[in-house]
A protein has these predicted regions:
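Membrane-embedded alpha-helical bundles that constitute the cytochrome b-like, heme-associated redox core
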Residues: 1-122
Length: 122
């Protein structure tokens, strides 16, 4: 049986809201970047570096990265609990799902740490 222990919020409605809000954050970030690319008169490395050197842009990027990871975790958790279970995968389905969730979690943590290193590293 699938438990809610590894769910993001223990509640399907809350997970749904988190995914919707995170998608709005990602969409706003993409629209801003697209507008910047389209309307920047000189899109050079210096201009791009200056944009991402601003603290507000670093924070916006970090918030978007965290929103993306929350969105991804909920989606991957849903895929794992729907398809990687005993009924669909046989007697090892629950173990496979556990491994899958650990790998997904480790990858998302690595992506966040890597993003922080890129944003504020030397």
């Amino acid at each position: 049986m699938v438990t809610q222990v590894t769910s993001f919020s223990k509640n399907g409605v809350s997970d749904w809201y988190i995914q919707r809000m995170s998608s709005y954050v990602m969409a706003a970030y993409v629209v801003f970047l697209l507008g910047f690319v389209l309307f920047a008169s000189d899109l050079s490395f210096e201009v791009w570096s200056a944009l991402f050197g601003q603290t507000w842009m670093q924070l916006a990027t970090l918030v978007t990265l965290l929103a993306t990871c929350a969105h991804a975790w909920i989606g991957m958790w849903t895929v794992g609990t729907d398809y990687l279970r005993g009924r669909t995968m046989g007697p090892k389905g629950d173990q496979l799902r556990g491994i899958y969730q650990v790998v997904c979690g480790l990858l998302l943590v690595a992506y966040v740490l890597w993003g922080i290193k890129i944003l504020w590293g030397n």
